[in-house]
């Protein structure tokens, strides 16, 4: 068993729009010039329906963005949320200690301090579920049938590919509140974003299918939970 910290986040469900026009445009591999730019992201459920969602975390990958501000919309009004300033990292995780309930997020990228062309490989808005040292047994799934489709559970379809990540994760000493939050998210969506850490740094960010049939035990003396999850990279 490998013992290393994991971060568990809700899955990123949103639709990207610019100029206040909702669309299903991808917000991966963005190249933004002619700054300043204002981007709007409408939060959805896993089926694409617009909803209010509780979020507290911004994750940026493969980016050269230096500074930006974010606002969240509630009841038709935008309020200040997160600020990025002086960033020099290509992967950024910003967490608000207090979750906000929002239906949309507005990202403003100013001209000042940013490069002429801002790139964002991937952007997502999440709910931070928990992080702790989880006992894990991780391996890379080798699929000899690359290009085929494979049904995992119900309407979940996995596109066969080489080197997909899969893991059995055992989380020990989990307080009841975190156990309930994490297990309910798995039951509701069967998807999580999982960030394994190696040497206290990002090793990768995985969007995963989770088997909704979870296993758990509770220590009656400590009232702490042990939760077992099976994850496969989408």
Regions found by a protein language model. Give the residues of each.
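Extracellular/virion structural assembly segments
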Residues: 1-38, 42-65, 78-234
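Beta-strand signatures of extracellular beta-sandwich domains
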Residues: 69-71
């Amino acid at each position: 068993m490998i013992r290393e910290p994991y971060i568990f986040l809700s899955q990123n469900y949103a639709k990207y729009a610019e100029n206040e026009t909702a669309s299903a445009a991808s917000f991966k591999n963005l190249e933004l010039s002619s700054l300043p730019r204002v981007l709007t992201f409408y939060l959805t459920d896993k089926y694409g329906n617009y909803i209010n969602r509780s979020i507290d975390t911004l994750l940026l990958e493969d980016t050269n963005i230096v500074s930006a501000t974010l606002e969240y919309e509630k009841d038709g009004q935008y309020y200040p949320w997160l600020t990025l300033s002086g960033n020099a990292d290509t992967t950024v995780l910003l967490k608000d200690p207090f979750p906000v309930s929002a239906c949309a997020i507005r990202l403003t990228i100013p001209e000042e301090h940013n490069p002429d062309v801002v790139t964002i490989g991937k952007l997502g808005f999440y709910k931070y579920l928990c992080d702790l040292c989880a006992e894990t047994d991780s391996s890379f799934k080798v699929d000899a049938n690359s290009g085929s489709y494979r049904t995992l559970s119900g309407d979940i379809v996995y596109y066969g590919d080489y080197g997909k990540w899969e893991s059995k994760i055992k989380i020990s000493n989990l307080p009841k509140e975190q156990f309930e939050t994490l297990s309910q998210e798995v039951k509701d969506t069967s998807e999580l974003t999982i960030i394994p850490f190696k040497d206290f740094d990002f090793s990768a960010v995985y969007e995963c299918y989770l088997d909704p049939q979870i296993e758990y035990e509770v220590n009656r003396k400590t009232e702490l939970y042990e939760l077992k999850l099976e994850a496969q990279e989408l």
